[in-house]
């Protein structure tokens, strides 16, 4: 037996040339020259493990701190919580308890996280390169046809015509939304005798009726009377719908607590500053407080506004190069099924481009810019809708801001009113409200009624929502979802462009109701 227990012996191995050579090795399975490397690698992996655990604990601690802070902020200011009502005393003035409530936390938008990955930034660079190609092609065509290098923005200038008038119209809309709902809430919350309170409540309802009249009638009157172009109409209709949804959310969230406060349950009325902040922050769900970021990154704000402007220019180039030359004279040619099908297929590419540009410009750039200026912490305005394998998931993740409003005030309140068994009816109600709102926006912006969006959203979209449900997974379903999106966008762009030019080539000799609601592109082929 040799001392030390580690005998050094010679081991014969074959070299590359078949020769045998002697190598020293110790007892065991690990070679001497590999042992230090293995120890270093083990220590490195242990350090990585400790670092990951520390980061995960920090994030979890931050999440729990934020949740606890929100719970403290929402706790009543009295020394003891308000008494719980008995189970049989639930009234319509109390909030429904069905479903989950929206919780706001500090988080970044998904695209901001993906932009940190170089591979995804390359896709972003490809879209910028596409814009450069459109600019180069426009310059080249103008130089060949007219012998000059000049970018013309006729379509952009036409679309945003009379924008100052739209901005002036926005002022009374905003003031009505700022003053009427809050003053109505104060009148309802005022203590006093029953007769005095009834008079104040009636005055509050009159204020809300005047507010609704201003929001519904004023923008429509200005748009029709002054023949505003599409982009200026967009400003009015988006603000009209936004103010209506925010007013409803404020009243829906604040009225139950206000009525309980009148009964002496110790609940404070909402502050005017919180309501003013809510009117500008990028959410449609009212809360007294929201998680806030510590500072404002003005370079991030400028970057998002610049990207939104770039998307507007991109959309103008797409319409001017891919849509206007195809559809401008289509109504002057004889109708044929072949021409209609080819026009729809031709419009799929510009249609999906327009969808992506609207998503990126509004749901990412515009909302993030305002969120940053207001230090609004929750930036989850959308989720990964592009990975959806069902249309039900696509509808939930495409526009989280609007989905939260529909879920809270249409679906959940529908279940509260009709019972938990009426989930199908509540879901149909969500589709009906959303489809009518989308069709109204299209009708307002384009200046004519052509229910393409209503049929696609309510009928086709509703069927696909139940047929392509969440149980379908896998890449094939994602491909099918994208195929349906391509075709749907092609149908919208093709039919709406045909109707736009048909109403200009074939004006009505006499304005009638049926002439206004009947598609002109079906009969205008001169």
UniProtKB/Swiss-Prot annotation:
A motif (FYXDWWN motif) lies at residues 381-387. Coiled coil: none annotated. The active site is at residue 438. An acyl-CoA binds at residues 393, 396, 399, 403, 411, 434. It holds the Pfam family MBOAT. The modification Cysteine sulfenic acid (-SOH) is found at residue 281. It is an enzyme of class 2 (transferase). Residues 79-88 have a biased composition (Pro residues). It is a multi-pass membrane protein. Catalyzes the formation of fatty acid-cholesterol esters, which are less soluble in membranes than cholesterol. Plays a role in lipoprotein assembly and dietary cholesterol absorption. Utilizes oleoyl-CoA ((9Z)-octadecenoyl-CoA) and linolenoyl-CoA ((9Z,12Z,15Z)-octadecatrienoyl-CoA) as substrates. May provide cholesteryl esters for lipoprotein secretion from hepatocytes and intestinal mucosa. Each protomer consists of 9 transmembrane segments, which enclose a cytosolic tunnel and a transmembrane tunnel that converge at the predicted catalytic site: acyl-CoA enters the active site through the cytosolic tunnel, whereas cholesterol enters from the side through the transmembrane tunnel. Belongs to the membrane-bound acyltransferase family. Sterol o-acyltransferase subfamily. This is Sterol O-acyltransferase 2. It comes from Chlorocebus aethiops (Green monkey). The gene is SOAT2.
């Amino acid at each position: 037996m040799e001392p030390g227990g580690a005998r050094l012996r010679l081991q014969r191995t074959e070299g590359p040339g078949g020769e045998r050579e002697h190598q020293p090795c110790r007892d065991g399975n690990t070679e001497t020259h590999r042992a230090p490397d293995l120890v270093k690698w083990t220590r490195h992996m242990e350090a990585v493990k400790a670092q990951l655990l520390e980061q995960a604990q920090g994030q979890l601690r931050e999440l729990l701190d934020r949740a606890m802070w929100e719970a403290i902020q929402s706790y009543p200011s009295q020394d003891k919580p308000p008494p719980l009502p008995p189970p049989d005393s639930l009234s319509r003035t109390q909030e429904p308890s069905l479903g989950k409530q929206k919780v706001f936390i500090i988080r970044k938008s998904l695209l901001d996280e993906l932009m940190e990955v170089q591979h995804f930034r390359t896709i972003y660079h490809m879209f910028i390169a596409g814009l450069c190609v459109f600019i180069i092609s426009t310059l080249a065509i103008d130089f060949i046809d007219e012998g000059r290098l000049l970018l013309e923005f006729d379509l952009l200038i036409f679309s945003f015509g009379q924008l100052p008038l739209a901005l002036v119209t926005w002022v009374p809309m905003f003031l009505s939304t700022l003053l009427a709902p809050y003053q109505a809430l104060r009148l309802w919350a005022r203590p006093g005798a029953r007769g005095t309170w009834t008079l104040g409540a009636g005055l509050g309802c009159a204020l809300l009726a005047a507010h609704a009249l201003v929001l519904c009638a004023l923008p429509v009157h200005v748009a029709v009377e002054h023949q505003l172009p599409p982009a200026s109409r967009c400003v009015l209709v988006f603000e009209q719908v936004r103010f209506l949804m925010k007013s409803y959310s404020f009243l829906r969230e604040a009225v139950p607590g206000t009525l309980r406060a009148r009964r002496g349950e110790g609940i404070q009325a909402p502050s005017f500053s919180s309501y003013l902040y809510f009117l500008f922050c990028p959410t449609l769900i009212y809360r007294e407080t929201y998680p806030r970021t510590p500072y404002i990154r003005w370079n991030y704000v400028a970057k998002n506004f610049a990207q939104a402007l770039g998307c507007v220019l991109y959309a103008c180039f797409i319409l001017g190069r891919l849509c206007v030359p195809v559809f401008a004279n289509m109504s002057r040619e004889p109708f044929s099924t072949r021409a209609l099908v080819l026009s729809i297929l031709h419009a799929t590419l510009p249609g999906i481009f327009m969808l992506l540009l609207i998503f990126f410009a509004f749901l990412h750039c515009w909302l993030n810019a305002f969120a940053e200026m207001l230090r609004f912490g929750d930036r989850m305005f959308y989720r990964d809708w592009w990975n959806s394998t069902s249309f039900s998931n696509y509808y939930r993740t495409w526009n989280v801001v609007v989905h939260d409003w529909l879920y809270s005030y249409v679906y959940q309140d529908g279940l509260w009113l009709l019972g938990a068994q009426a989930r199908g009816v509540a879901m149909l109600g969500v589709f009906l409200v959303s489809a009518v709102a989308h069709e109204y926006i299209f009708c307002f912006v384009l200046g004519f009624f052509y229910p393409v969006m209503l049929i696609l959203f309510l009928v086709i979209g509703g069927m696909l929502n139940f047929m392509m449900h969440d149980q379908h997974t896998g890449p094939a379903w994602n491909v099918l979802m994208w195929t349906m999106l391509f075709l749907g966008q092609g149908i919208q762009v093709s039919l709406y462009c045909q109707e736009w030019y048909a109403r200009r080539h074939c004006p009505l000799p006499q304005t009638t109701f049926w002439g206004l609601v009947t598609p002109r592109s079906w009969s205008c082929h001169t």
